[in-house]
């Protein structure tokens, strides 16, 4: 788990210099996770309450964001194969302002094996931050 934390921290710090926008996080270290529900045609529904007791990596991205593409490629290559079968780990990759159809089309090209969740109106991502992607949160 230490490697996950180090990987996430390194990714966050390295990508801050490439971010499209800047804004303070709404969620701060020590805060409880905001209540939310994500719906995906391909991956079903997940509620924040379902995540209790798990280590959760939340990644917020957009299909047009260059740094997001680099980060997700690394997640696919390094992180997902190692932790995808760990019942105490959950990864939520959330497409900010994207629909299910847009994410399905995007994933045809990218061939990611981790689940993608749409957030077309920023109803979930807006509870974490209003700007700046990619953005990742490690929650335990």
Describe the role of every protein-language-model region:
Residues 1-4:
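Positively charged n-region of N-terminal signal peptides that target proteins for export
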Residues 7-16:
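Bacterial N-terminal signal peptides
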